[in-house]
């Protein structure tokens, strides 16, 4: 036996779940009921981590606002979830793809074919930090369900040395795996139904947290007005329909008027709203938005105060 091989049996994510001891004997309906029962732990874990998640949102928003980036880094399921969440930001918020990025051990090939052995190389995590030129303007969140992934620890150590803000997202309590980071998010959801299969509850709760961080950061930097995605990228028919409905709903105009307004404003919903509300020319509305760092509400308030 390799003397350097650590026993991870004490980790919450590696333990056997007493509720699923008869997993191989369950009917399909019983199996579904057990999944639903166990998934309730995800909601409770996220609620317990609310303050740390809120701090991560603030760090991410600050990074993007100052021209930096939000990075997720991980291996296996954890890394893939980071890539997935990052990939959804440009179509939803019309954000620059550089602003939110996922780094996966093994690169793009590992997104589709498992390369789990790569997670053991802490030096590869450090190399990734250098390759992406991560520095003081950036915020990097390391994701590892069991908390021990060397690739993630190597990346976070290198990121801290480079002056970046760092965060850690794990499904084990801090007394099982300690780490020095700026924000430490722990969402212990208990042992998995299939012991050690952290693509299950751990994967679910990880995606819940990432949803909150990326969406919260985009709200903070002005990508949302009310609960509408006013910076939506109008790149297909579904999104064009959504853009027209946003304009129709918020401005009480018909779809034909909404289409004309959108076309006159470079297919920018946010600019179209501001132009309609203020009566400015499209170029003037665009300039006012730029003056207020893209915050529609701030631009409307500033215009109203001058009248």
UniProtKB/Swiss-Prot annotation:
Pathway assigned to this chain's UniProt record: Amino-sugar metabolism; N-acetylmuramate degradation
Annotated SIS domain residues: 60-223
Record-linked Gene3D superfamilies: 1.10.8.1080, Glucose-6-phosphate isomerase like protein, domain 1
Keywords for this protein: Carbohydrate metabolism, Lyase
This protein's record includes keyword Calcium: no
Enzyme Commission designation: 4.2.1.126
Uppermost EC category: lyase
Tree of life domain: Bacteria
Catalytic residues (positions): 88 (proton donor), 119
Other known facts: A lyase-type mechanism (elimination/hydration) is suggested for the cleavage of the lactyl ether bond of MurNAc 6-phosphate, with the formation of an alpha,beta-unsaturated aldehyde intermediate with (E)-stereochemistry, followed by the syn addition of water to give product.
PANTHER family for the chain: GLUCOKINASE REGULATORY PROTEIN
NCBIfam families membership: N-acetylmuramic acid 6-phosphate etherase, PRK05441.1, PRK12570.1
Family named by the database record: Belongs to the GCKR-like family. MurNAc-6-P etherase subfamily.
Protein task: Specifically catalyzes the cleavage of the D-lactyl ether substituent of MurNAc 6-phosphate, producing GlcNAc 6-phosphate and D-lactate.
Protein name: N-acetylmuramic acid 6-phosphate etherase
Organism of this sequence: Synechococcus elongatus (strain ATCC 33912 / PCC 7942 / FACHB-805) (Anacystis nidulans R2)
Lineage: Bacteria, Bacillati, Cyanobacteriota, Cyanophyceae, Synechococcales
């Amino acid at each position: 036996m390799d003397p350097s091989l650590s026993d991870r049996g004490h980790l919450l994510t590696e333990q056997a779940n007493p509720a699923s001891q008869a997993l191989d004997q369950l009917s399909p309906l019983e199996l579904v009921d057990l999944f639903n029962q166990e998934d309730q732990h995800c909601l409770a874990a996220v609620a317990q981590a609310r303050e740390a998640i809120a701090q991560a949102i603030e760090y991410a928003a600050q990074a993007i606002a100052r021209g930096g980036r939000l990075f997720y880094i991980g291996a296996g399921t954890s890394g893939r979830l980071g890539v997935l969440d990052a990939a959804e930001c440009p179509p939803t918020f019309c954000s620059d793809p550089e602003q939110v990025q996922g780094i996966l051990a093994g690169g793009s090939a590992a997104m589709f074919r498992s390369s789990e052995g790569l997670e053991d190389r802490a030096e590869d995590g450090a190399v990734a930090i250098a390759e992406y030129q991560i520095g003081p303007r950036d915020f990097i969140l390391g994701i590892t369900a069991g908390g021990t992934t060397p690739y993630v620890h190597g990346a976070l150590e290198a990121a801290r040395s480079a002056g970046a803000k760092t965060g850690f997202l794990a499904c084990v309590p801090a007394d099982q795996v300690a780490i020095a980071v700026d924000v430490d998010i722990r969402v212990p959801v208990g042992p998995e139904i299939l012991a050690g299969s952290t693509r299950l509850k751990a994967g679910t709760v990880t995606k819940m947290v990432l949803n909150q961080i990326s969406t919260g950061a985009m709200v903070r930097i002005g990508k949302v007005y009310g609960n509408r995605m006013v910076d939506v990228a109008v790149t297909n028919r579904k999104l064009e329909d959504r853009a027209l409905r946003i304009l129709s709903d918020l401005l009480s105009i018909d779809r034909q008027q909404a289409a004309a307004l959108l076309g006159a404003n470079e297919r920018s919903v946010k600019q179209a709203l501001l132009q309609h509300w203020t009566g400015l020319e499209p170029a003037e509305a665009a300039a006012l938005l730029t003056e207020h760092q893209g915050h529609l509400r701030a631009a409307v308030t500033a215009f109203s105060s001058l009248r």
